[in-house]
């Protein structure tokens, strides 16, 4: 699975560094325009390869993702769909990429991307009603997007209930998110506790378990696990193993999150796990990348 979908909370300030268990779009790294020439050179190299069109498209998607040219990513995914046909995975990627662009744009300009996001997720679920990443993404989108723009809170709740029947851990997480955003702390905590119990039972830190546990989930699920465990200080080992698996996987080259945030999460989890020395090294790495990253500055000031 690819990691193109991220949570959609459309009233966040893009540049804020607010910490929340269910918000992470504001930690997407935006690459400077200074890299445009390097980007062009990398694309030009691909076009000289003797490969099929579909292989070149897949490589171009990786390069465009690396340089955050998300409009290009959308064009390439649409071309891939023209060649290979629609699939839940491709529609999930397409919906997620449109969602990121919707978040980055001003509200008026985000409407077209919101529509494309919702349409892609809906079509993906027609092809496979049990596609877990799409279900989780669609639930979040439907609950977060204003009704006038296509959101539907009642539908989101029904889908979350269905998701719980397919995957308990994903369903519990979606229900916790819904109640958290609705400021119903009692129900949010109820589903979070169920999520943590399910996470504990998966024993993802055992040697072969991560591949088994995450085989039908998006890479973003790993980030969700590490983010939520670090925020609530529960199931720390599982959160750390999930984050390490994310960083060490071959799909990390598709990572869109800022490395300073990734190092912050790992530093916090490592600290909570009792390793202050390693945590200090990681938080310094975060601040070396971005000396103004407030979460890391605050964490360093309070804990060291």
PLM-predicted stretches and their roles:
Residues 15-75, 89-92:
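N-terminal leader/linker segments that initiate helical-solenoid repeat arrays
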Residues 56, 90, 134, 171-173, ...:
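TPR alpha-solenoid repeat register
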Residues 68-75, 86, 92-123, 127-130, ...:
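Short coil/linker segments at helix-helix boundaries
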Residues 45-46, 80, 124, 162-163, ...:
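Canonical positions in the second alpha-helix
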Residues 140, 144, 213-261:
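Alpha-helical adaptor scaffolds
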Residues 28, 53, 62, 87, 96, 103, 131, 168-170, ...:
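Residue-level recognition of tetratricopeptide repeat
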Residues 25, 59, 93, 100, ...:
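"A position-specific structural signal for the A-helix of alpha-solenoid helical repeats
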